Amino acid sequence: MRTLWIMAVLLLGVEGSLVELWKMVFQETGKEAVKNYGLYGCNCGVGKRGKPVDATDRCCFVHRCCYKKVTGCDPKKDRYSYSWENKAIVCGEKNPCLKQVCECDKAVAICLRENLGTYNKNHRVTVKFLCKAPESC
């Protein structure tokens, strides 16, 4: 029950590309992004940093690094457009910055799908203080 409450709090005030990211993750993995990845490992979710605990967590680490390279827009708030064509994500954004955000989100969604075999339910709620020092991007 407590986990559901935490997830509900994380959803408050969500806007912009996070919604698109969550849709992409569901389309690629079949898993609800917030429930399955919102607190996963040491890198998935808001404010988490640390040495990745597995390949799934590394996807989130690489995604955060990708967002750090984005300039000219806010990756977490500004909305972009994409489509789902023949079971593939197609970033259709004309704005170069928003296209870059879309490509970052597409990459993490595909990475999570490719690493479904490393997904460990024991890492679904990892407490931040248990994480080791983060790597640099």
From Swiss-Prot:
Cystine connections: 42-131, 44-60, 59-111, 65-137, 66-104, 73-97, 91-102
**Is the keyword Protein biosynthesis assigned to this protein?**
no
Please give the InterPro entries that the UniProt record associates with this protein.
PLipase_A2 (IPR001211), PLipase_A2_Asp_AS (IPR033112), PLipase_A2_dom (IPR016090), PLipase_A2_dom_sf (IPR036444), PLipase_A2_His_AS (IPR033113)
Q: Does the keyword Signal apply?
A: yes
A biological process from GO: phospholipid metabolic process
Tissue expression: Expressed by the venom gland.
Catalytic activity annotated for this protein? a 1,2-diacyl-sn-glycero-3-phosphocholine + H2O = a 1-acyl-sn-glycero-3-phosphocholine + a fatty acid + H(+)
Q: Which residue positions does the secretion signal occupy?
A: 1-16
Listed A to Z, the keywords are: Disulfide bond, Hydrolase, Myotoxin, Secreted, Signal, Toxin
**A Pfam family this chain is assigned to:** Phospholip_A2_1
Q: What is its main location?
A: secreted
Provide the transmembrane region boundaries.
Answer: none
Enzyme active site: 63, 105
- Tell me more from the record: The sequence shown is that of PeBP(R)-I. PeBP(R)-II differs at two positions.
| Described function | Snake venom phospholipases A2 that have myotoxic, and edema-inducing activity, as well as extremely weak lipolytic activity. PLA2 catalyzes the calcium-dependent hydrolysis of the 2-acyl groups in 3-sn-phosphoglycerides.
Could you identify this protein by its name? Answer: Basic phospholipase A2 PeBP(R)-I/II
Q: Which organism is it from?
A: Protobothrops elegans
